[in-house]
Amino acid sequence: MTKKKTEKEKGINNGYITQVIGPVIDAVFSSGILPKIYNALEVQSKEGPIICEVQQLLGDNRVRAIAMSATDGLQRGVTVIDTQAPIAVPVGKATLGRIFNVLGQPVDNLSDSVGEDTLPIHRSAPAFTDLETKPAIFETGIKVVDLLAPYRRGGKIGLFGGAGVGKTVLIMELINNIAKAHGGVSVFGGVGERTREGNDLYMEMKESGVINETNLLESKVALVYGQMNEPPGARMRVGLTALTMAEYFRDINKQDVLLFIDNIFRFVQAGSEVSALLGRMPSAVGYQPTLGTEMGALQERITSTTQGSITSIQAVYVPADDLTDPAPATTFAHLDATTVLSRGLAAKGIYPAVDPLDSTSTMLQPLIVGDEHYKTAQLVKETLQRYKELQDIIAILGIDELSEEDRLVVDRARKIERFLSQPFFVAEVFTGSPGKYVDLENTIKGFNMILGGELDDLPEQAFYLVGDINEAISKAKTFKN
């Protein structure tokens, strides 16, 4: 008994492995000093230490843990050390411009120094008394988003779009704009996506200046990756690692933070794998019975407090395009807005290719955004919807067969469609056009002028890839000359 106490005082609590099934490890510890749920266990292997997280206490002094890296080469009898704390990751300014894994270890072949500050990845959501309850618009400077599907400060946005329609460029522009307009930073969590995509994103961020190679502390983003080739434990926890880094910027640095999760479906998928490995009975469509709890634990920590905010943009993969699948259906319950990217618009060369009719937001209410913004947004949608209805007639009979009123609608809709495009700062290197940040007031003013018929005599090309309406008017003059 005395020996146990001494070991506990020294902080030593060793056990040994009794079973290894893939990424799941069972270990036996001395009676009375079992590791707590979510404690990190360290197992020595030939490849270096393997960190596991305690998930279940099985009785008979046995615990079941899930490994955060490959368990190749482990065998029964190997010593397991209880670290007596959950996984903790580095936080603060030193994380900017760096790439981390789920354990907060740098994986970008730069220096291992990432500052002294660390926080555990398992934390409580902010207390209700600390929350900012008044809904506020989070201005992005992107016309189509701010007008038709505005983001809530501290809200959660679902980003839907296939390959090659501009998700990455939109994400990088948002990272750039929050840094310039809000003095905020971003954290990108790559959850269970392709390693190639993670590498491409990193290279593009360096190219566009979002990551400053010469002075990393001037970078605007920290990257956390747990890619497809990682064990399910890492993919399930990497979202929490990214969120913990974001929480520090919000709570300690009192900044506005953008948290990107790509892809939230992979978080659910990893949880499903872990659940099966832990022997839980599957629920609907084979998902884990704890799906709602796991999703809630992550999403409830993403919020606005009186100190700062975390606004989260989550890429959502919809399996087999089935919106009733439990994974996307559970995600939708937490979202404040959806941004849908359209392949049709991308094919027309209209970037950002945000679908103005499919994208939605709970913020688009007169009481929140004001009457003028609401009416303008509704009129823009009505005009575009009418144009969509007329497209079949135009394709068969031609535009000349339309009534004068409908021709005017088509003319204005085409101008609106082009005016919804915008040159991005991060795309300057590809397009040669300088990026534009358009504030909400100028966005509303521009669309009101088009809808009111003040610009009916201007050519539609003048509205393509411009910032505010004054730029479109100036561009039209160059055509006339």
UniProtKB/Swiss-Prot annotation:
InterPro entries on file: AAA+_ATPase (IPR003593), ATP-synt_VA_C (IPR055190), ATP_synth_F1_bsu (IPR005722), ATPase_a/bsu_AS (IPR020003), ATPase_alpha/beta_chains (IPR050053), ATPase_F1/V1/A1_a/bsu_N (IPR004100), ATPase_F1/V1/A1_a/bsu_N_sf (IPR036121), ATPase_F1/V1/A1_a/bsu_nucl-bd (IPR000194)
Subcellular location: Plastid, Chloroplast thylakoid membrane
Keyword tags: ATP synthesis, ATP-binding, CF(1), Chloroplast, Hydrogen ion transport, Ion transport, Membrane, Nucleotide-binding, Plastid, Thylakoid, Translocase, Transport
Residues the entry annotates as binding ATP: G161, G162, A163, G164, V165, G166, K167, T168
Keyword Iron: no
Pfam families: ATP-synt_ab (PF00006), ATP-synt_ab_N (PF02874), ATP-synt_VA_C (PF22919)
One GO location term (cellular component): mitochondrion
Membrane topology summary: Peripheral membrane protein
BP GO terms, sorted: proton motive force-driven mitochondrial ATP synthesis
Enzyme class: translocase
Membrane-spanning parts: none
Intrachain disulfide bonds: none
GO molecular function: ATP binding; ATP hydrolysis activity; proton-transporting ATP synthase activity, rotational mechanism
Catalyzed reactions: ATP + H2O + 4 H(+)(in) = ADP + phosphate + 5 H(+)(out)
Enzyme Commission (EC) number: 7.1.2.2
Family: Belongs to the ATPase alpha/beta chains family.
PANTHER family associated with the record: ATP SYNTHASE, ATP SYNTHASE SUBUNIT BETA, MITOCHONDRIAL
Matches recorded under NCBIfam families: atpD (TIGR01039)
Protein task: Produces ATP from ADP in the presence of a proton gradient across the membrane. The catalytic sites are hosted primarily by the beta subunits.
Complex formation: F-type ATPases have 2 components, CF(1) - the catalytic core - and CF(0) - the membrane proton channel. CF(1) has five subunits: alpha(3), beta(3), gamma(1), delta(1), epsilon(1). CF(0) has four main subunits: a(1), b(1), b'(1) and c(9-12).
Name of this protein: ATP synthase subunit beta, chloroplastic
Organism whose genome encodes this protein: Pylaiella littoralis (Seaweed)
